[in-house]
Design a protein with these regions (language model features):
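Conserved N-terminal beta1-alpha1 strand-loop-helix module at the mouth
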Residues: 1-224
């Protein structure tokens, strides 16, 4: 089953809507410059009300490992998504205490061999590339490149996904998971609950149509 991560969660209503629709992973953005940044206390409150089987992912951009660990102690997220320019050493230091999803902003010029340098990372999130921005741009990632990466790595496809294109993205890439934020919003940080359900329904429909028999139940970052 393809994992579905709804990112940019800032309030309990959106978190509940995502879970009710079938999402199994929620992203909480702690990057101070993000339009979807969540207040730490709000993230902790939302996390406390999530079912145990729903994964909470803390999203960071160039944060210090010590700061990530301190925030984790308060919010109790299950995995860290590193969405900046973090080195393999930084990723390994974070991965020593919790599972890491390393994000890359990719276009046709991205070298897939870069992924091999991050040996301790649980999964890679491939996002659309736009100069000077760390995600949430709505820019589509290079699906062909992502497809190649997915043959040898756990790939979470992100960047420009929405109801209208997620089925085709899954057909092309066959990813471990999909990630969406801006594609389901009425405004930054507020989800359209109707579109959210449509998106998740499209993912599950695509799985059935393609006959995907992927079982990632043993590959949840909560229990790597």
């Amino acid at each position: 089953m393809i994992r579905i991560k709804i990112c940019g969660i800032t309030n309990l209503a959106d978190a509940k809507a995502a879970i009710d629709a079938g999402a199994n992973s929620l992203g909480f953005n702690f990057y101070e410059k993000s339009l979807r940044r969540v207040v730490t206390a709000d993230a902790a409150q939302i996390r406390s009300k999530l079912p145990k089987e729903v994964e909470a992912v803390g999203v960071f951009v160039n944060a210090r490992p010590a700061d990530i660990n301190s925030l984790r102690a308060f919010v109790r997220f299950d995995a860290a998504q590193l969405h900046g320019d973090e080195t393999p050493d930084i990723a390994s230091r974070v991965a020593s205490s919790l599972p890491v999803i390393k994000a890359f902003r990719v276009d046709a010029s991205f070298a897939l061999t870069t992924l091999n340098r991050y040996a301790d990372v649980f999964a890679f999130l491939l996002d659309g590339a736009r100069a000077g921005q760390y995600g949430g741009t709505g820019q589509t990632a290079d699906w062909e490149l992502a497809r190649c990466a997915a043959t040898s790595h756990r790939i979470i496809l992100s960047g420009g996904l929405k109801v209208e294109n997620v089925a085709e993205a899954i057909r092309v890439v066959r990813p471990y998971g999909v990630d969406v934020a801006s594609g389901l919003e009425t405004k930054p940080g507020k989800k359209d609950h109707g579109r959210l359900k449509e998106f998740i329904d499209e993912v599950r429909r695509a799985e059935q149509q393609l006959g995907l028999q992927l079982d990632h139940s043993k590959e949840n970052p909560i229990q790597p």
